[in-house]
Regions:
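Glycine-rich phosphate-binding loop signature in dinucleotide/nucleotide-binding domains
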Residues: 29-32, 196, 200-202
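Flexible "cap/lid" loop of the alpha/beta hydrolase fold
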Residues: 51-99, 126-129, 155
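Conserved alpha/beta-hydrolase catalytic His-Asp/Glu region
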Residues: 94-139
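Conserved serine/cysteine hydrolase catalytic core
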Residues: 125-167, 171-187, 191, 200
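Gly/Ala-rich beta-loop-alpha elbow adjacent to hydrolase catalytic centers
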Residues: 37-42, 46
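Active-site loop/oxyanion-hole signature of alpha/beta-hydrolase fold enzymes
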Residues: 8-35, 49, 72-77
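Short, amphipathic alpha-helical "lid/cap" segments that border enzyme active or binding sites
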Residues: 20-24, 186-194
Length: 202
C-alpha cells in the first residue's frame, strides 16, 4: 500500500519536529514494514522519522539527507544552487520561489504551462526549518537508495552526490533531470522505488 504525506505551508507549525512526528504516526498506522520516500526537504523528514522500528528502508529523490548535527541549510551552503537568488521570504517567514523564475529554477525540463501550474500551487516551506539539525540519521543503519538530478537548480548536484556517497546507498541513479524529477522522469524514479521495495520484500 502506498501512502502519501504532503506538508503544506498552511498545515505545519514552525517546528519541523511536527513534520517528523506526523510521519511517524502515519508509519505506525501501517500494517507491516515501511519504505519511506522523500523528495527535496522531505528527505530531511524521512532521515529523522526513519528511525521508527517499522521503517525498513529509505529512498531519496533529489533530496536532503543530513548527517548527525547537520541541517539542510548547512548542506546548501556547501554548494549553493543556481536558483538560490530566486527564493524570497514573505512577511511570515515562508520561502517562495518567485513566480516568474519558478519554471527555470524548479522544473526547466517540463513545459512552461506545467511550470506555471507548479508555480501557482507551490507549497512554501518555513525558512527556519532549513536550520533544524538532525539528531540521528536513519540512513546510517538502514538500507537506502538515492536518485540524483544532474540538472537540479534547487539542490546542487554536487551536494546530492556527496550525500548519496556518504550514506553508502544500495543504488544511486543519476537522471538528466531538474529538481522536479518525479514529474519529468517518472519512469526512472518509479523504477528505483520499485527496485528498493522489491529488494526489501525478499
Amino acid at each position: 500500500m502506498i501512502r502519501r504525506q504532503v506538508f503544506s505551508a498552511s498545515s505545519i507549525s514552525s517546528d519541523s519536529s511536527v513534520r517528523v512526528e506526523r510521519t511517524r504516526k502515519m508509519i505506525g498506522q501501517q500494517n507491516g514494514p515501511v519504505l519511506l520516500v522523500g523528495h527535496s526537504y522531505g528527505g530531511a523528514v524521512i532521515t529523522q522519522a526513519g528511525n521508527h522500528p517499522d521503517v525498513v528502508g529509505l529512498a531519496y529523490i533529489a533530496a536532503f539527507a543530513p548527517d548527525e548535527g547537520e541541517s539542510p541549510g548547512g548542506i546548501t551552503q556547501q554548494h549553493v544552487p543556481e536558483a538560490a537568488p530566486h527564493l524570497e521570504p514573505d512577511s511570515d517567514g515562508y520561502l517562495w520561489l518567485k513566480a516568474g523564475k519558478f519554471h527555470e529554477s524548479f522544473c526547466q525540463d517540463l513545459t512552461s504551462d506545467e511550470g506555471l501550474v507548479m508555480a501557482v500551487t507551490q507549497k512554501a516551506p518555513l525558512g527556519g526549518t532549513f536550520g533544524d539539525r538532525i539528531s540521528w540519521p536513519a540512513w546510517a543503519n538502514k538500507p537506502s537508495w538515492y536518485q540524483i538530478s544532474s540538472e537540479d537548480r534547487m539542490i546542487h548536484p554536487d551536494n546530492q552526490r556527496m550525500m548519496s556517497t556518504r550514506m553508502n546507498a544500495r543504488k544511486v541513479v543519476t537522471l538528466p533531470a531538474s529538481h522536479a524529477s518525479l514529474a519529468s522522469r517518472p519512469v526512472g524514479v518509479a523504477a528505483l522505488i520499485h527496485e528498493a521495495a522489491t529488494e526489501l520484500a525478499r
